[in-house]
Amino acid sequence: TALIDSRSMFIHGITERLASLDGYIAAASGYTLNVIRRSGSYVGTGSYVKVMNGDEQVAFYTVILYGDVNGDGIIDDDDFGIISNYLNGTDTEQLFEGSPFATAADVDRDGAITQADYAIINDYLTNGEPINQA
């Protein structure tokens, strides 16, 4: 199941390559969920979940997949490159503070995007070390 943070309005605790959030979250009786993917075929960072009561939107959440900093629902070399560029100062536009992408890049959740986050993603890509999504 996914974790819903009502303070930050983030949903996290999902895995890569999900076409839907079925089995991760469910709407309470009388409500429906509308999932809007940010890009591609998978639910990833920056995707949205609207909680609807009929035609009325009653809540709005943003999905965070730690390590997925481009929002395609896959943690791969593209994400690794974005963090690398951020750390060497050549591209800071996508990872501005407070954005869901910056949150996803801070995989160790210490409040900053650092070499430690870079190393965790590298370990995931090269050794299959899991990234904590909880």
Each language-model region and where it sits:
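Cellulosome-associated attachment modules in secreted, modular CAZymes
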Residues: 1-134
